[in-house]
Design a protein with these regions (language model features):
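Nucleotide-activated sugar donor-binding and catalytic core shared by glycosyltransferases
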Residues: 1-174, 184-305
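Short beta-strand segments
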Residues: 176-180
């Protein structure tokens, strides 16, 4: 909206040729578009969400523009990745004037950054206005990682969806909503037997559509969703899924959050045990909000540039 107010209405979306396994390519059409937009707009600050290659390219081509980069703690410090890879990523991210690392765990500067702050996760504005009320709705949020991922991660996503479908049969008093973020996952789930109390959503819903009336959220252990649940205090089951890299990061997230209303399970949990845990959690109340988002800290740092 800010760009549109200044005459930039042609906001483009990246296509597969614009990115690789470590982010946007500054040398393809989207990269060219970003560089051209910056030259035309001439901003005081450029804010980048990750994107190591693009951060490096912008520093080379626009040396006088202030750059702030938003990072996950695992982008800066990750023992599961080899040292050479982390050295490379950190060197590219350190081209920015400011690094804002936001997540569920705090880390310290490794000495390569110009200006560095580690804070709690930055939450979406709509999360702040969620008004939660009691209901009989359980939401399984399959969420991120369902597009352009490996077979192992997609398989674990399907396993979680099937587990919730089976659980719904034993929880007839509740409505089980399964939220898919890609058509391939939705189509695969839709081929299974679907009980009457299961609702399949083919696309991502607005946060208020499920947080407002969920008695329980079932999701994988990603940084953003766990942070939102910690802030809202909604009972949740967090599933550790995916490849070794993602499982390690998710385990770190759960350890850092240490919340009584969020319980972790493996994808191979017994159905009866899973249903028992669901019933136990839906009978609990939302806990008091103790998680303070990192939004204000991030804004203050950017304004001080």
């Amino acid at each position: 909206r800010y760009l549109e107010s200044h005459g930039f209405e042609d906001i483009r979306e990246a296509i597969p040729m614009d990115y690789c396994s470590i982010g946007l390519l500054p040398t393809n059409k989207m990269g060219q578009y970003i560089h051209q937009t910056i030259r035309t707009f001439n901003p005081n600050v450029v804010l980048i969400d990750g994107e190591p290659l693009l951060t490096h390219s912008l520093r080379i081509s626009h040396p006088n523009i202030k750059i702030a980069v938003l990072l996950n703690p695992a982008d800066v410090r990750n023992d599961e990745n080899d040292k050479e890879s982390m050295d490379y990523f950190n060197t590219l991210y350190a081209c920015a004037d400011l690094a804002i690392v936001h997540g569920l765990r705090k880390i310290t500067d490794n000495g390569t950054y110009r200006d560095f702050v580690s804070t709690n996760t930055i939450l979406r504005p709509e999360i702040m206005s969620v008004y939660h009320k009691t209901s009989k709705n359980i939401y399984c949020v399959l969420g991120g990682g369902t597009v352009n991922v490996g077979h192992q991660f997609a398989a674990s996503t399907m396993a979680l969806a099937e587990l919730c479908q089976q659980a719904a049969v034993l929880m007839s008093d509740y409505t089980m909503h399964i939220i898919c973020s890609s058509s391939n996952i939705y189509d695969a789930i839709n081929e299974n037997y679907t009980p009457n109390n299961v609702v399949l959503h083919s696309h991502v819903l607005n946060a208020s559509d499920y947080y407002n009336d969920a008695c329980l959220i079932i999701t994988r252990s990603g940084r953003n969703t766990l942070s939102e649940l910690a802030f809202l205090g909604i009972p949740a089951i967090s599933v550790i899924t995916g490849d070794d890299y993602r499982r390690k990061e998710q385990t770190q997230n759960l350890k850092a959050i240490n919340s009584d209303n969020i319980k972790a399970i493996p994808t191979n949990i017994d159905l009866v045990e899973f249903v028992a845990l669901c019933k136990k959690l839906v009978d609990t109340s939302c806990v008091q909000r103790t998680f303070i988002p990192g939004n204000d800290t991030a804004i203050r740092k950017i304004l001080s540039m």
